[in-house]
Amino acid sequence: MPLLDSFKVDHTKMPAPAVRLAKVMKTPKGDDISVFDLRFCIPNKDIMSEKGTHTLEHLFAGFMRDHLNSNSVEIIDISPMGCRTGFYMSLIGTPDEKSVAKAWEEAMKDVLSVSDQSKIPELNIYQCGTCAMHSLDEAKQIAQKVLNLGISIMNNKELKLENA
């Protein structure tokens, strides 16, 4: 089985919060599809709470679209990593990492401004597979931690695993 791109980087060297351009590929029509690693926690040192991660999943994608989508960039999806240390963001176009970091920072401020749990999008039995597993307070704690620590840019060359 071929090694996935996400396993070709040394997770012991990853800073967090940090942005990494993980992959760029071309569609058959020549458009760039980019995948960003938005690392909220240092791998194997910290983890996002289950409920906080789920609530962020509902809030983060919309807020990131508000701050990053443009004539040359369109977010396809933002999904939490199974390890709960971050999210992957797939998009059409390839914004620079500083723009992604700025949009992420603004999105975290937006999370902090959500007034109560009833304002979480798609939080109902029809649109969410586990609608009882949410915590706006935990999502806000995650967002505040990102803002307190600041978002850095990861260097793929420094993270590359030998023989990967």
Swiss-Prot record:
Cofactor note: Binds 1 Fe cation per subunit.
Enzyme class: lyase
UniProt-listed Enzyme Commission number(s): 4.4.1.21
Keyword terms, alphabetized: Autoinducer synthesis, Iron, Lyase, Metal-binding, Quorum sensing
Family matches, as Pfam families: LuxS (PF02664)
Source organism, top-level taxon: Bacteria
Molecular function per GO: iron ion binding; S-ribosylhomocysteine lyase activity
Catalysed reactions, semicolon-separated: S-(5-deoxy-D-ribos-5-yl)-L-homocysteine = (S)-4,5-dihydroxypentane-2,3-dione + L-homocysteine
One GO biological process term: quorum sensing
Subunit structure: Homodimer.
Entries under NCBIfam families matching the protein: PRK02260.1-2
HAMAP family: LuxS
Protein name according to UniProt: S-ribosylhomocysteine lyase
Organism: Campylobacter jejuni subsp. jejuni serotype O:6 (strain 81116 / NCTC 11828)
Gene: luxS
